[in-house]
């Protein structure tokens, strides 16, 4: 096939598959946050990508501080910087929900327009603070290089790290939603807001924490993003369409659907863009998803919701 031997073709497919897993990990983190905000709360957050950018810039600032003032901590700073990225994105998300989103519940068109305007404002703030050019964080040495399971296959260590972060965050979110009192409040508010309020749940505070949590997870996605690409003011907006596709295709209130959808879309794009052009690969993936959604509008998985 195209001058490739079977061994070469196998190595290419494995590396493209792993590249798809790296994309899957970032998409998964982005989609997890959006699934909580959009799926659990019904809020269309067009600024979700900018919260990813906040996390990425938080990593960049931490790398500058570590390399300039604390060089001895440079090999270890990245783990702490991920936590900082989460806290910063969480805090900004909390403020946005309190100042803007809470006034727009049950007004989806107004929410869409308001968050779209917010995304443009945030992008301009990024340009004013960090400049229009893309920046890169200084990565620790243990994130550099590749693992070679065979002489013809190279698997980047940063991709393995991104996958590990994605798995840990996914497990943490599942435990939070299904094994904690706060997760019980979130699910109760989603299923029946009036009844949840009647039994004493502060639904306004639950909404605020839920929205902030989704933004914080997007911040972690931004932290993971810095290991595989440079960061610019519009980096997050490049992922927002794919992220909405993941959530809608998987089922808006299903975490399992989000997992399956992110994996399917990432692998399809990674493999198709190798055999086609980048644009054709994405178009083919999008058209396939549209056809499937025409046949199954509720997505891959559905969740029972009481009204």
Region spans (language model):
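Helix-loop-helix "hairpin" substructures at the membrane interface of multi-pass membrane proteins
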Residues: 152-231, 255-260
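Hydrophobic alpha-helical segments within and immediately flanking transmembrane helices
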Residues: 34, 47-67, 92, 114, ...
